[in-house]
Amino acid sequence: MPSSSSGNSRHFSRVAPVVLAILDGWGHREEVEHNSIRSAETPIMDALWHAYPHTLIEASGAAVGLPDNQMGNSEVGHLTIGAGRVIRQELVRISETVQAGRLGQTPALIALAERLRKSDGTLHLLGLCSDGGVHSHINHLCGLLHWAAAAGLNKVAVHLITDGRDTPIQSASKYLHQIEDAINASGVGELASLCGRYWAMDRDHRWERTIRAYEVLTDPNQSISRVTAEDVLSASYANGTTDEFLEPTRLSNNYFKDGDGLVMFNFRPDRARQLVQALTLPDFDGFPRANQPSLDVVTFTQYEHDLPVGVAFPAESLDDLLGQVVSEHGLRQYRTAETEKYPHVTYFMNGGIEQPLAGEERHLVPSPRVATYDLAPAMAADTLTESCVNAIESGVYSLVVINYANPDMVGHTGVMGAAQEAISTVDRCIGRLLDSTGRMGGTLLITADHGNAELMQGSDGQAWTAHTTNPVPVILVEGEKRKLAGYGNDIQLREGGGLADIAPTLLQLLDLPKPDAMSGLSLIQAIDSPTPSARLPQPV
């Protein structure tokens, strides 16, 4: 930290930080109806939007390396923000492999098939069954069934995790029919279990949920449903239980046994990790395991470094990320979020690097332990803001990154009143960040990673719990000690940008060079200057 001394006293100069506030799930939609953002009390954000440079940027589809019209998500959004370029996402990589019929060329799957042919074990296929494209895609499961048939694996059990969060809340029947068609077309496979993602895909160490999914997969004494999968869904809906919360249900006697193989086809790690830990780690202590079958496991992507599993699609390495540039120039940075979004501002934003960079400090604020976040719309936002204000005013961090989970996590519940409260909470917290950053002479850049809370009801009248393809806002509040040289007060934010432009913008604000690998462009330009041609960086 720079310092100067005078006489016997020593004075440390305080850094005026650049603060990036990511409002998770805060998309832009003009219509007020079913829009928890436009209909909530947001005096701070409204005032900033009208008084400071602002724009809208793309956070879905090709702008973040996804297929056209594919909604963005937190993992992809933070990866793109940190990379400063469009990255070909796992959904695209895996889909291209499936469509080309190349799953059988994947080394991890080749090895698994060879071992199962020798052991005569059952192949279990487990994952989220929908076309949401956030954690998985049903086409990948269909591809796995055809791969298994071609590989001579005739004993195949399919374990479906129902969605209702990234898809309509009662849409599982459609996907169930698709899987039944794929089973018939491939000639292999049996529906073995159903389980809502609430139980199977927890990421907050709520082990009382994970154990329910674990037991339906491993317990030989679990009762088998006497009705069809379709009947299970119908009964669930009649009881007011939607897809996300579907009770774990065994449909056949095909549970996990010693010598079996498992492919977990979720490609997003954060919500697949806990269940796979329970299935594979010898020293797992999240809950007592009455049954611990010895399995040969392959996951589609790397969920964490120390899992004893094969990985079908290893990560592509990334360099010259935002955090690396800041670190390599000897500057300190601070990343903070509550439990639900902590991996996003750390692991994902750093391109899949788990260890902090030199000079990077991370602070986790626990999320409230409630069943669903409509019961606590404020979540931990006030505590999170307090910790961030302390970091800003410490005067040691050049870059401060904070994520507010409320718009996304409460938006996912589909409860309008709770979402409005969540939005107003975040608005109030932005006011505190603004005051703190201003006192330090720093600059505040506000954006979001994808849309969600701006649409709370679908055209069918059902609650909308998924993300959207809407653009997201960017607002720049320059600080007195961070004024950009050569612009005066004549700054505007250009149109036609995407999330890949956030890192180059931050580097310009920090007066740091943009690496050649960052194909994104700063959003900052002088008023009335020509706007760069609206082009999206090409995936790498």
Curated annotation (Swiss-Prot):
Top-level taxonomic group: Bacteria
Biological process according to GO: glucose catabolic process; glycolytic process
Catalytic site positions: S74
InterPro entries: Alkaline_phosphatase_core_sf, BPG-indep_PGM_N, Metalloenzyme, PGAM_B_sf, Pgm_bpd_ind
Binding site for substrate: H135, R165, D166, R197, R203, R268, P269, D270, R271, K341
Membership in a protein family: Belongs to the BPG-independent phosphoglycerate mutase family.
Subunit structure: Monomer.
Protein name as annotated: 2,3-bisphosphoglycerate-independent phosphoglycerate mutase
Native source organism of the sequence: Prochlorococcus marinus (strain MIT 9313)
Gene that this sequence comes from: gpmI
